[in-house]
Regions:
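Residue(s) in the substrate-gating loop at a strand-loop-helix junction
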Residues: 143
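Canonical Rossmann dinucleotide-binding motif of NAD(H)/NADP(H)-dependent dehydrogenases/reductases
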Residues: 2-34
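C-terminal substrate-recognition "lid" of short-chain dehydrogenase/reductases
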Residues: 120-123, 179, 213-242
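Alpha-helical segment proximal to the catalytic Tyr-Lys
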Residues: 128, 172-176, 233
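Conserved glycine-rich Rossmann-like NAD(P)H-binding loop of the short-chain dehydrogenase/reductase
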Residues: 29-46
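Active-site helix of classical SDR
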Residues: 123, 159, 167
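Substrate-binding pocket helix/loop in short-chain dehydrogenase/reductase
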Residues: 99-100, 107-112, 194, 205
Length: 246
């Protein structure tokens, strides 16, 4: 019997990286997985196969998380397909870095839409289902950049700070309905995206980390499992940093 046996989890942006690691971790603990991405390409199809290997129900959905209407439709379909929505992980995210004075309105708007508005969209669509169930766990993927800020990432920092504020507010609004909301703030995590950085940049990052190394997607997935499961039944409105001590 796994920690999440019989539960249904929605994980956004789960075709690769941290989202994929979370979906696989949940599946290993018995959760049925509905994951979304802008398109379900070869990466998404491979993710679906890897999750299915755990013997759970899984389906990938192509959806624009930044669209309120698209999100409402996909959550309705997921509820029909799976019968419940017990866990929501808002992981969809992009970066469009640049110094503030050189940043275009389009760069700002795109990051806020995908990183922050998408979380509002999914929470708004999933909350009525969770309220009827009288239970649910919402996990927002934030970042240490949302806690400390970072030069050249004002749009990303603002979106991730917003994810923290959103989780804390939802925790207060929905706690009486048995719904918990928390945020995870990863630090430097080794993914396909960060693997493209130069050795010099990665070495500089490691110098700033007390543990002197980057984290893995599995490090983040372990915390997500804790927050999704009954192990954290009295934890809500919190931000857990997974950053090696930064």
């Amino acid at each position: 019997m796994g920690l999440l046996t019989g539960k249904t989890a929605i994980v956004t942006g789960a075709a690769r990286g941290i989202g994929k690691a979370i979906a696989l971790k949940f599946a290993a603990e018995g959760a049925n997985i509905a994951f979304t991405d802008l398109v379900i390409d070869e990466n998404g199809q491979n993710t679906e196969k890897e999750i299915a290997a755990y013997g759970v129900k899984v389906k990938g959905y192509a959806s624009n998380a930044a669209s309120f209407e698209d999100t409402a439709k996909v959550v309705e379909q997921i509820h029909k397909d799976f019968g419940s929505v017990d866990i929501l992980v808002n992981n969809a995210g992009i970066t469009k870095d640049g110094l503030m004075m050189r940043m275009s309105e389009g760069q700002w708007d795109a990051v806020i839409a995908v990183n922050l508005k998408s979380a509002f969209n999914f929470i708004h669509a999933c909350t009525p289902i969770m309220m009827r169930q009288k239970q649910g766990s919402i996990i927002n993927m934030a970042s240490v950049v949302g806690v400390h800020g970072n030069a050249g990432q004002c749009n990303y920092s603002a979106s991730k700070a917003g994810m923290i504020g959103l989780a804390k507010s939802i925790a207060q609004e929905l706690g009486s309905r048995g719904i918990r909301a928390n945020a995870i703030a990863p630090g430097f995590i080794i993914t396909e995206m960060t693997a493209k950085l130069s050795d010099e940049v990665k070495a500089e990052w490691n110098k700033r980390i007390p543990l002197r190394r980057g984290g893995t997607p599995e490090d983040v997935a372990n915390i997500a499992l804790f927050l999704a499961s009954d192990m954290s039944s009295y934890v809500s409105g919190q931000v857990i940093q997974v950053d090696g001590g930064m």
